[in-house]
Amino acid sequence: MGKVIGIDLGTTNSCVSILEGDEPKVIQNPEGARTTPSVVAFKNGETQVGEVAKRQAITNPNTVQSIKRHMGTDYKVDIEGKSYTPQELSAMILQNLKSTAENYLGDTVDKAVITVPAYFNDGERQATKDAGKIAGLEVERIINEPTAAALAYGLDKTETDQKVLVFDLGGGTFDVSILELGDGVFEVLSTAGDNKLGGDDFDQVIIDYLVSEFKKENGVDLSQDKMALQRLKDAAEKAKKDLSGVSQTQISLPFISAGENGPLHLEISLTRSKFEELADSLIKKTMEPTRQALKDAGLSTSEIDEVILVGGSTRIPAVQEAVKKEIGKEPHKGVNPDEVVAMGAAIQAGVITGDVKDVVLLDVTPLSLGIEIMGGRMNTLIERNTTIPTSKSQVYSTAADNQPAVDIHVLQGERPMASDNKTLGRFQLTDIPPAPRGVPQIEVTFDIDKNGIVNVTAKDLGTNKEQNITIQSSSSLSDEEIDRMVKDAEENAEADKKRREEVDLRNEADSLVFQVEKTVKDLGENISDEDKKNAEEKKDALKTALEGEDIDDIKAKKEELEKVIQELSAKVYEQAQQAQQQGQEEQGSQDSTVEDADFKEVKDDEDKK
C-alpha cells in the first residue's frame, strides 16, 4: 500500500502529516508554515488557497473563510457567476494539502485519513468524504479529532493504563472526549460537544466590542461596511492571539471609515481582563459538554489522569484556567494544539497500512440513532457513545390491517419524541402482502461503519424484500438542535415523561379498541346482543375520545372498555367451563354404566363357580 497522509481539515487552519518510520511528521507548506489557513479566494478566474488567500481577504470580497461550519448543509457560495458547495471549497483546501505532501514526498498521494469533530453528524461526515473524493483522495478513514489527538499523545505511553480527557476547542467547533489508554488500545468512553462554538466566536465578541466602542465615539456603525468588517476580523484575531502572551494590546486601524470632517481612525486598547469578560459566556459554554462527557463515561474529575488541550483557542489563558478549575488538574503541555490532530491522523494511516502495529482504536457514535414509531415516538436502536463499527437490528410490524408499505423515518438525538430529534433521512419499504396489523415482521437494521456513517436497512421477513438508505443528510445540527438532543433531555425530563406517558396511553387505548373488535367478532353468537351492544358503545366512546386532546377522558373511557372486555372474557370463560363440566358429567355417566356391566359380568362368573 502506498503512502497514506493524515489531514486535519480545520475551520480556520488545516495541517497535513505523514508517518516517517514510526513517528508522525508535520509537513511544511511552500511558505514554510506548518499549518495552512482554511481560506479560498477567487480572482479573475484564478483560485488561491491558504496564506495568500487570507492576505488579500480585506480587498477581495470573493474570499471564503470557515467553510467547515457549513459542511453537510445546502449552503452555497456564489462567486463570479458560479455556485460552490462547502464540499467543493473544502476540496480546494484538501488539494492544496495533497500538493504540499506530494512535493515533500516526491510521489503521488491518493489516499488519506481525514479528521472531523467528534460531534459531526452523518451528513457532515459524508460531506467530508465527498470533499476528499473531489480532491482526488480516497478517504481511508474518517477519524474524530479528539481521538486523533489522543493517538498522537499516547502512542509512546501504551504500557500504563490511564484515562485521558481531550478538550478540543478549534476555530469553529468544540469537542470533549474521554479515552482509556492501555496495552495499545485507545478506547473512547464518551464524547460531547458543540458544532457551532470555536475561535471564530471569540473573534466575534472582540469585533462586536470594537464596533460598539467606535459607534459610541464616532456615531458610525462599522457593521454595515463589509471591508471595514474584514479589517476588524483580522485585527480581532490578532488581538486574541496577542492577549495569550501579553496583558494588553493596541488595536490600530487607520482610515477605517469616513465622517463629515474627513477620515476616521480606530484606536482602542484592549486588556486581557476585558477580553476575558467579553468571552466569559463562551468559556462557560464549554463546561457543560465537559461535565456531560464525564457523566456519560461514569467518571469523576479525580479519575482523570491527564488533560490534553487541542485547537488554537485552548491557548487562551482563561480557557486553560477554566479547564484546570473544572477538572482540578494542570493541562498537559507536551503537545502542539495546532498539529497534534494531524499527527494522530498520520498514526491512524500507519495503523491502516500496517506500519504501526499493536494499536487498536475504538471510537464511538456521538448521538443516539433510531426510528419513529407509532405515536410519534423515537425508538432508539443504537445509544450514544456506542463503540463503532456496530450493527443493531429490531423487528417491527404494521399499524393497520392490510398495510401495503411502511415509512422508515431515521432519527438522531436524545429526546423521546421524534419531532424533537434530527431527521437523518426517510425511505419506504413497499409491497408488503395483505395481512392483519401486527402480523408482518419488518426487521430494521442500523449499521454504523468505522467512519461513523450510517446505513439503514428494512427487510420484510415474510418476503425477504429489502430496502436500504445510506444517510446523506442535507442539513447540519444547529446549536438549538444539539441543545434539544442532549441538554434539553435532562432539562425537560418531566415534560418528556408526561408526553411519553400520553403516547403510551394512546397506543394502549388504540390496541384495546382493536382487541375488542377482534374479540367480539371471534365470539360471534357466544355473547348476547346486549353484551355486544355494550362493548360496541364503549369502544366507540373510546375511539371518539382518542380523536380529542383530553387525556383524562381517554383514560376514563379506556378503563370502562377494559372493564367490559374483562366481563366478556369472564362470561366466555364461564361458558367454556360449564360446557366442559357438562361434557365430563356425560362422559362420567357413560363410564359408570360400563363399569357396572363389568362388575355384573364378574359377579356372574363367580356365581357360576
UniProtKB/Swiss-Prot annotation:
Residues 574-587 have a biased composition (Low complexity). Residues 525-542, 597-609 have a biased composition (Basic and acidic residues). Residues 525-554, 574-609 are annotated as: Disordered. Pfam families: HSP70. GO terms for molecular function: ATP binding; ATP-dependent protein folding chaperone; unfolded protein binding. The keyword RNA-binding does not apply. Keywords: ATP-binding, Chaperone, Nucleotide-binding, Phosphoprotein, Stress response. Induction: By stress conditions e.g. heat shock. The keyword Phosphoprotein applies. InterPro entries: ATPase_NBD, Chaperone_DnaK, Heat_shock_70_CS, HSP70_C_sf, HSP70_peptide-bd_sf, Hsp_70_fam. The modification Phosphothreonine is found at residue 173. NCBIfam families: PRK00290.1, prok_dnaK. Belongs to the heat shock protein 70 family. Acts as a chaperone. This is Chaperone protein DnaK. It comes from Staphylococcus epidermidis (strain ATCC 35984 / DSM 28319 / BCRC 17069 / CCUG 31568 / BM 3577 / RP62A).
